[in-house]
Design a protein with these regions (language model features):
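NAD(P)-dependent aldehyde/semialdehyde dehydrogenase
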Residues: 1-116, 126-167
Length: 169
């Protein structure tokens, strides 16, 4: 449903862009959604309403693609400072292409919580975080691990936050 804080809304394609692989990704996702997910009827109306609204409001759209009404993708021309306000639901995604992942760093703020990644080495991500002084994104996790919970969540040590220490002297 893409309603959780860990749900994907934006896909950033970084590096050398392969259009065939990108299309294959979206088609595979659409086919998987058709096989494994029964969306409520209202979701189609909500998704189409969002789509029409975005077509009117968003001035930096590069292209749009609809995959069997299961997946909608809106490719953006730029990674703007208000990107975190773009929220997709019911198989509705925004996407952005960049040759260099560092280009998105200046617009990442504290509203970003989790970045799931595929095709990046941990050292590359660490360099991205340190060299760009990233102010947001508390978790960088591989695709498929966004719901994994640990003692540190969204930058907070849950164990310390949810326990108290009683001192007797």
């Amino acid at each position: 449903d893409q309603n959780a804080c860990s749900s994907p809304h934006l896909i950033v394609w970084a590096g050398k862009i392969n259009e065939i692989r990108r299309q294959k990704f979206w088609k595979t996702l659409s086919n998987l959604v058709k096989l494994k997910y029964q969306a409520p009827e209202l979701s189609s109306v909500d998704k189409y309403h969002k789509f029409c609204s975005d077509l009117i409001k968003l001035k930096d759209l590069n292209s749009v693609k609809i995959y069997d009404n299961c997946v909608y993708t809106l490719k953006l021309k730029k990674f703007s400072e208000t990107m975190e306000n773009l929220r997709g639901r019911w198989g509705y995604f925004y996407e952005f292409e960049t040759k260099n992942i560092n280009s998105i760093s200046k617009n990442i703020n504290r509203k970003y919580q989790t970045m799931t990644y595929f095709g990046f080495k941990k050292d590359t991500l660490k360099k991205f975080i340190i060299s760009n002084n990233i102010k947001g994104i508390d978790r960088f996790v591989p695709v498929g691990s966004a719901l994994d919970i640990n003692f540190v969540w969204d930058g907070y040590d849950l164990f310390k936050s949810l326990t108290r220490i009683i001192e007797v002297k």
